[in-house]
């Protein structure tokens, strides 16, 4: 069963969180709406179906390949029960997930407001309105439409009692997702089930001194795969780390900016400034052969190779106690991408359990990832500190 590997933790449930705004009204749902990397719609759809099946809720997905949008329509059970169990940061391929309430076809494009108000009037109330489009239309016409609709739609929804007078977190947020000028999906979002980021995308600023754009990838991983408290716990000044396949040095550079002393392993050339940095030791070696002389806090690995090979080597690092934490990318094949991720996670789980190592493994396709997913494996005191047993 695909999903984030839960070696010491079950899928997070809403019962462990504070009272959800979902309990404040009656919302009738038709499915789930998710955004993912364009081209990964099938994997995202499968992920939603897997989560739904755990709640004995079933449905089917409508996929337009290359759009980055998945509309999973429920055919049996309540999609709200599924949505309540989702935490988007724990999804692998979905970067945003909403609970879809209404699939609205606009017949008269001179009035898009009335059909939306009529559809939503009988349901529960919302604390904020977002009108958005996940689609990249070249002329930006959908973006313009979303912008133009915001003021009249907000006013009409407020008058109808659908939208609260002032913004509030006590109620779910309403997302009107424009898939075309004639097609709007009304969806509900609460956090952390849905991402608080617009379109689920973190907007990170690339710093010119970074040796490569890959620096954004590792920054996003730390930002989105850990809560602020977890991040503070696992990433500290004075730690030591190893970067396998480090050149030209984006990941090493990022770790050094966090105060971590790094050993950068690659046959390729590291950026000159990094070579001269006293916090960096460069080793020209094979990343699949290199072994640390003593245990480190972090191993990170961005080598482009077969995912199973990378996974085995990362399992070596964790099982032989060479590192406490590992962050690495699995480059996915063109086909059977889901199977590959599943097989790799299963293998890692077997290795860690075989070595009697308690761990928490998180997997995510980040916005800055391409044909790959990022894996974060956490062992040691992290598990007791955050009660993952
Ligand atoms: C995608 S790049 C890494 C980019 C790097 N993370 C950054 O932020 O700049 C992959 C690197 O892996 C290196 N590489 C490939 N196979 C390797 C191996 N077996 N051992 C060490 N490095 C390897 C390549 O030389 C290349 O520099």
Swiss-Prot record:
Q: Where does S-adenosyl-L-methionine bind?
A: 214, 247-250, 266, 286, 302
Keywords attached to this Swiss-Prot or TrEMBL record, sorted alphabetically, are: Cytoplasm, Methyltransferase, rRNA processing, S-adenosyl-L-methionine, Transferase
Q: Which reaction does it catalyse?
A: cytidine(2498) in 23S rRNA + S-adenosyl-L-methionine = 2'-O-methylcytidine(2498) in 23S rRNA + S-adenosyl-L-homocysteine + H(+)
Keyword Secreted in the entry? The reply is no
Q: A Pfam family name for this chain?
A: FtsJ
Q: Superkingdom of this entry's organism?
A: Bacteria
EC number(s) given by UniProt: 2.1.1.186
Bias (Polar residues) ranges:
1-13
InterPro entries to which the protein is assigned, alphabetical: RlmM_FDX (IPR040739), RlmM_THUMP-like (IPR048646), RNA_MeTrfase_FtsJ_dom (IPR002877), rRNA_MeTrfase_M (IPR011224), SAM-dependent_MTases_sf (IPR029063)
| Protein name, UniProt field | Ribosomal RNA large subunit methyltransferase M
**Location of the active site:** 331
Question: What is one GO cellular-component annotation here?
Answer: cytoplasm
Recorded GO MF terms: S-adenosylmethionine-dependent methyltransferase activity
Extract the ranges annotated as region (Disordered): 1-24
User: What is the similarity comment for this entry?
Assistant: Belongs to the class I-like SAM-binding methyltransferase superfamily. RNA methyltransferase RlmE family. RlmM subfamily.
Where found in the cell? Answer: Cytoplasm
What is the protein's major site of localization? cytoplasm
